[in-house]
């Protein structure tokens, strides 16, 4: 009896990560994710802080508080995505339980970087950007 209970608990523990994973993204989800990111980058190019901030997740909005504070951070620390010369979408992978869009970017200085955009789905089904991480192309690929 104890062996059966132990076997059941082991099977449950092994199945837990699979059950906790999100359902695969649909083609429309992938398109929506890319659209949100594209629209934010276009807002950066126009210096439209309110529009750019609107594509950030509620957590990111709480963290920065205002569109102005958010834009100041982007201008100072995220120059490649603020003023990209090239902005090419790569694949979407799962990182830390979130769909994460990889983008190959050439910044205004000609330097290549990979931008990783973790995404979050809101209760209404829409997608928002939950952060952005820049890495050099030489760094470990996701």
Stretch-by-stretch model annotation:
Residues 40, 44-51:
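Short helix-adjacent coil turns
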Residues 29, 36-37, 43:
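N-terminal capping segments
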Residues 16-20:
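Sec/Tat signal peptide C-region and signal peptidase I cleavage site
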Residues 23-24, 31-35, 49-98:
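Short solvent-exposed beta->alpha transition segments
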Residues 91-142:
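Exposed beta-sheet edge and beta->alpha loop/turn motif
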Residues 1-5:
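Positively charged n-region of N-terminal signal peptides that target proteins for export
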Residues 7-15:
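Bacterial N-terminal signal peptides
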């Amino acid at each position: 009896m104890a062996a059966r209970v132990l076997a059941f608990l082991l099977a449950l523990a092994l199945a837990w990560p699979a059950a906790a994973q999100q359902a695969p993204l649909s083609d429309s989800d992938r398109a929506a994710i890319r659209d949100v990111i594209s629209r934010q980058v276009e807002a950066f190019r126009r210096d439209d802080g309110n529009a750019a901030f609107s594509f950030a997740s509620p957590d990111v909005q709480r963290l920065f508080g205002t569109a102005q504070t958010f834009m100041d951070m982007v201008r100072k620390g995220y120059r490649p995505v603020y003023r990209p010369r090239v902005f090419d979408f790569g694949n979407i992978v799962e990182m830390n339980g979130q769909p994460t869009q990889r983008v190959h970017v050439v910044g205004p200085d000609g330097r290549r970087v990979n931008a990783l955009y973790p995404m979050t789905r809101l209760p209404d089904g829409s997608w928002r950007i939950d952060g952005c991480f820049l890495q050099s192309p030489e760094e470990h690929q996701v």
